[in-house]
Amino acid sequence: MSLYNNIFDAHAHYDDKWFDDDRFELLENIHTKGVCGIVNNAVDLEMPLIVHDREAHGDVYDLLRKYKPNALVHCFSGSVELMREAVRMGMYISLGGVVTFKNARHSLEVASEIPLDRLLLETDAPYMAPVPFRGKRCDSSMIIYAAEKIASLRNISISELLQITCDNAKQFYNIDD
């Protein structure tokens, strides 16, 4: 890999010199550099960054620690400890229909403990429809189910939770009234 580490070459006659592991490493390197570029651009342009870190918490958080963007972790799937780290870095956490699932222990713990000024709601449409719509196509009208569950966990009214998360969204996206 060292001969070709700094280039992406499409010459087919080199094909016999590459092994599957080398190709995987090259593609992973290209992907990582692309993601770094996106994160860096968000920081340089002072734009909000929406991050989906599914099955890549360690790598993603390494990048976020390095670049320190204004970030929202979309469809958060991590532990309470990971949520706390994200909050310490000033990030927002977005939760959706998963909090209505019976087996969503991590999401319920996060929903119970996240500082309310760091919480956003989402649907992740067309996926992750909340109970009672599991297995169906999710849409934005279903966000209320996540809001009801989180409000119940936090012992606050749904309208209060919706106001808080609306204010948080305005803050994150830099929207003036």
Report the location of each language-model feature.
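Mid-domain alpha/beta scaffold segments of enzyme catalytic cores
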Residues: 1-177
